[in-house]
């Protein structure tokens, strides 16, 4: 039996994650003989703490060991299992990412535009197709396609005080910005 694919692992591990109201955000497999590694990155509307991650690591390890013992999967001579959250540098690619990061700062870059603009994440539309962006000091007029001023003109947050709606699309590259103070709940 070959080393399992990320798809196979996701199929096997999703019930464990969903039992804790978590989503598997990413599975990373690094094959290197005795030093192979399987990384499982989980997140949820309620962020998992270290105790929950430890419990899930135990459950996932037991499930993978049982599958290997049954001959359904093979991890080779040995592997290291890492169960964690994806971290702040994970791009926001699904509506749930935007919902979970409401009130945080986000750097947004649309394909074809050179620089990213920093906005604060507002409410996600009920149909999860758009998100409200609240201007910050680093915000421009608004991302293209947001219903904001056309022509690429820039304005400071002093000039541009109204939130804009950004349609969620694959052309949007967005990453949460690290903020050392508590974000406001506007």
Which ranges hold each PLM region?
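Short Lys/Arg-rich amphipathic alpha-helical segments
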Residues: 1-186
